[in-house]
Amino acid sequence: MIALIQRVSRASVVVDNQTIGAIDKGLLVLLGVEQQDTREKMEKLATKVMSYRVFSDENGKMNLNLEQVGGSLLVVSQFTLAADTGRGLRPSFSGAGTPDQALALYEEFVAFCRAKGVTTETGQFGADMQVSLVNDGPVTFNLQV
């Protein structure tokens, strides 16, 4: 399971000209599901995302996590993160989770974060989305479990 996280001052998702999810300070999470992913991996990754220290403390050091800064999550499914780009000029998605598996783990990821008290907005699974963000830093990390 892959989470590409970006520290943002704001981010939003639009589907069919309607904003369906938006946050101010927090993390935009692009979430990719691979074939071998499980609920256990999802919980481990969600915990890491929420606990990862990517926000600056009073000394400018990345030492604070999402909860410590009162931040929110915007979680967007992105199967292209599971692409194999090692050969040729066209990505292979053979390692990506099935749509049913990915939807289930995506929904469980969101529910897990919300259950931990984190304000969590979402995109729309499988939709053509326009994602806008102001990357603060820029700060971007590729987390995998």
Curated annotation (Swiss-Prot):
GO terms for cellular component: cytoplasm. It is found in: Cytoplasm. The keyword Amino-acid biosynthesis does not apply. Its main location: cytoplasm. It holds the Pfam family Tyr_Deacylase. Keywords: Cytoplasm, Hydrolase, RNA-binding, tRNA-binding. One of its GO terms (molecular function) is Ser(Gly)-tRNA(Ala) hydrolase activity. It catalyses: glycyl-tRNA(Ala) + H2O = tRNA(Ala) + glycine + H(+); a D-aminoacyl-tRNA + H2O = a tRNA + a D-alpha-amino acid + H(+). Disulfide bonds: none annotated. Belongs to the DTD family. An aminoacyl-tRNA editing enzyme that deacylates mischarged D-aminoacyl-tRNAs. Also deacylates mischarged glycyl-tRNA(Ala), protecting cells against glycine mischarging by AlaRS. Acts via tRNA-based rather than protein-based catalysis; rejects L-amino acids rather than detecting D-amino acids in the active site. By recycling D-aminoacyl-tRNA to D-amino acids and free tRNA molecules, this enzyme counteracts the toxicity associated with the formation of D-aminoacyl-tRNA entities in vivo and helps enforce protein L-homochirality. A Gly-cisPro motif from one monomer fits into the active site of the other monomer to allow specific chiral rejection of L-amino acids. This is D-aminoacyl-tRNA deacylase. It comes from Shewanella baltica (strain OS185).
